[in-house]
From Swiss-Prot:
Biological source species: Mannheimia succiniciproducens (strain KCTC 0769BP / MBEL55E)
Catalysed reactions listed for this entry: GTP + AH2 + S-adenosyl-L-methionine = (8S)-3',8-cyclo-7,8-dihydroguanosine 5'-triphosphate + 5'-deoxyadenosine + L-methionine + A + H(+)
Cofactors, names only: [4Fe-4S] cluster
Protein name, UniProt field: GTP 3',8-cyclase
Chain residues that bind [4Fe-4S] cluster 1: 33, 37, 40
Binding locations of [4Fe-4S] cluster 2: 265, 268, 282
Protein family (similarity comment): Belongs to the radical SAM superfamily. MoaA family.
Length: 337
């Protein structure tokens, strides 16, 4: 495990050595997921032999409080499937009440949306990303291992009914599986305020063969969009890495997340904390910096902030995916993608 010294670093902002400032925290609250997606957990969630508890509500409050004190404005709750936690609403309420936090976002597989999305909104979830890898129910089942396509679609409609003005939908782009649905997805968002985001398949330790078989560059879609009159939109400082395209004839938008693109890391603005309390500087990076020993008491906040800053000074300028190095990540379920 990486050892980070505790010292008075003389700063209260999350700024790395390349002058990138980190406004955005992706916080995994569980590794557990009830879907069996082919590109992530094809055999379903397998509990580790040495069971370690996920972050408690108090630990979550302390870690997000430290990030907020150092300039973080947006927190995204990920997993696993974050809504599987029994205290999910309490987590949202706690984070949204912290000083400095302006947005609490959620990434979900959507299986509970129809029933629970109104409660999520009241608790403080300001935006939702839903994973939908196919608009064909049979293909959806083939990719996710769950026959819940119609349930997820109803959940998205319910979110609009109760007041969400925009929903983001994530689809992992896979050659010969769902890339042929691009026009179908595009037509789906023509009259709906949906930002349809296509994410390039990413290489991880357990999925090398899958990656080699199904990876498709998002640049192909970017060129297609530009030819059809779509316009690249400017980013806000808390936005994620997606390149977002809009079109005057479409209510919805198209986003492309292309981690293999040159300069992908230049505008990095997010850090990640795993469900077991490790800080990860990069999705494709190191083993992680353990924070849990500094989440025991509220009196540890200053030391916790010092460790966060010290760790951040070791963040690389960019990942090494182009060299075939995806770090130690065996899959994306434990860190929320």
């Amino acid at each position: 495990m990486q050892s980070i010294p505790i010292k008075n670093v003389g700063t209260n902002r999350l700024v790395d050595t390349f002058q990138r400032e980190y406004y955005y925290l992706r916080l995994s609250v569980t590794d557990v997921c009830n879907f069996k997606c082919t590109y992530c957990l094809p055999s379903g969630y397998q509990p580790p032999v040495q069971k370690e508890s996920f972050l408690s509500l108090d630990e979550i409050r302390r870690i997000v409080g430290a990030f907020a004190a150092m300039g973080t404005e947006k927190v995204r709750l990920t997993g696993g499937e974050p809504t599987l936690r029994k205290d999910f609403l309490a987590i949202v309420e706690t984070i949204s009440a912290l000083e400095g936090i302006k947005k609490v976002a959620l990434t979900t597989n959507g299986y509970r949306m129809e029933k629970d999305v109104e409660r999520w909104k009241k608790a403080g979830v300001s935006s939702i990303n839903v994973s939908v890898d196919s608009l064909d129910p049979r293909q959806f089942y083939s990719i996710t291992g769950e026959n819940k396509f119609h349930q997820v679609m109803k959940g998205i409609e319910r979110a609009f009914e109760i007041g969400y003005e925009k929903i983001k939908v994530n689809s992992v782009l896979m050659k010969n599986l769902n890339d042929q649905e691009f026009d179908r997805f595009k037509n789906w968002v023509k009259d709906k305020p949906i930002q349809m985001r296509f994410i390039e398949l990413m290489q991880t330790g357990e999925m090398d063969q899958f990656f080699n078989r199904y990876h498709l560059s998002g640049q192909i879609l970017a060129e297609k969009l530009l030819k059809e009159g779509w316009i690249l939109r400017q980013k806000d400082r808390t936005d994620g890495p997606a390149k977002v395209f809009s079109h005057p004839d479409y209510l919805g938008e198209i986003g492309l997340i292309m981690p293999y693109e040159k300069n992908f890391c230049a505008s990095c603005n997010r850090l990640r904390v795993s469900a077991k309390g490790k800080l990860h500087l990069c999705l494709f990076g190191e083993e992680g910096v353990d924070l849990r020993d500094l989440l025991v008491s509220d009196e540890q906040q200053v030391i916790l902030q010092s460790r966060l800053y010290a760790a951040l000074q070791g963040k690389r300028e960019h990942h090494l995916l182009a060299q075939g190095n995806s770090g130690i990540r065996t899959n994306l379920a434990s860190i929320g993608g």
